[in-house]
Amino acid sequence: MKFSLHDIHQFRNKLLIVLSMLFFLLLFSSCKNNIENSKITSTPTATSLKNSESSTTSRRINVVLATIDLAIGRNRLTFGLVDSDQSPLRVDSVKTDYLFMDASKIEVLVEGEAKYVQWPVSKSGVYVSRVNFDTPGTWMIRVKGIDNDGNNFFAETRFAVKSKSFTPAIDSKVPQSQNKKLSDVEDISEISSSTDPDLKLYELSILDAINNDLPTVVVFATPKFCMTQTCGPQVAIVSKLREKFEGQVNFIHIEIYENINDIDGDIEKAKISPIVMEWGIVSEPFTFIIKRNGLLHSKFEGYTSENELFDAIDRVINFKK
């Protein structure tokens, strides 16, 4: 697939905007507690349900979505919680519900739970939830929980659900990309910014992997230039899983930028890889698990724990959703 210069500039700007949003979430990890937490009474809005816990006395906090590529169908939605003093709020799990805001009657359509996942390189982390959206448009997530001092808290925010995701949809055919392999370059540094790259992650192209009758894990990440600082740890997890599933699954790492040796500390010099554009990736890291038949099994935007990826790989090996 060929892209015009205009397409490349547009895509690059979109990527940098999204990464800036995620970097904003990361910055909360460096904030210190400077003021005491205060309790407020949440006033129900026209979009709130009368019996919602949001109408009880709770501390209102902020929720920051870390997932950008949301569309109808199955989604892995992640978010951070930020307290009134701008420090990250960390508890084991929170309750979530989702409302479709474009309906004539606003009501809870999906209820669930989100569990906390610590990021490996900071005091921040995200909450991970699974949700199936059946309608595109404006949705609201409401988060309720109890902090480590036993106090109730509440947060809500609106977000857009698209009719079609930027990245390949679940159960759709993935692009048969011909990414550069170790055999195509003179030095591994041309296709990997990892400090200690696992050479086995660079033996296959996506096209090769689709044609060898094994499931495939593809991680798009740029360890050296990652704005959220989670790309290196994510690639390391994929490498560790490669060892566990040796001979059962293909594993591939692809850089976000195609000229990693030319950037030299100036991200303005970075050129988005055409394969990143082909896959519609607008954040980093991004991990995909592909079935033997070349259809997408699952996808993971942002940092994903080893356990979560292990479970998904185990399911695809055993033909489970």
Regions found by a protein language model. Give the residues of each.
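Bacterial signal peptide processing site
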Residues: 32-35
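Contiguous segments within soluble domain cores/interaction surfaces
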Residues: 37-188
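Short active-site neighborhood of thiol/selenol oxidoreductases, capturing the structured segment around
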Residues: 206-227
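Typically the conserved alpha-helix immediately C-terminal to a functionally engaged Cys/Sec
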Residues: 228-245
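Thioredoxin-like thiol-disulfide oxidoreductase module
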Residues: 256-284, 289-293, 314-315
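Non-catalytic, surface beta->alpha helical segment in thiol-disulfide oxidoreductase systems
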Residues: 292-321
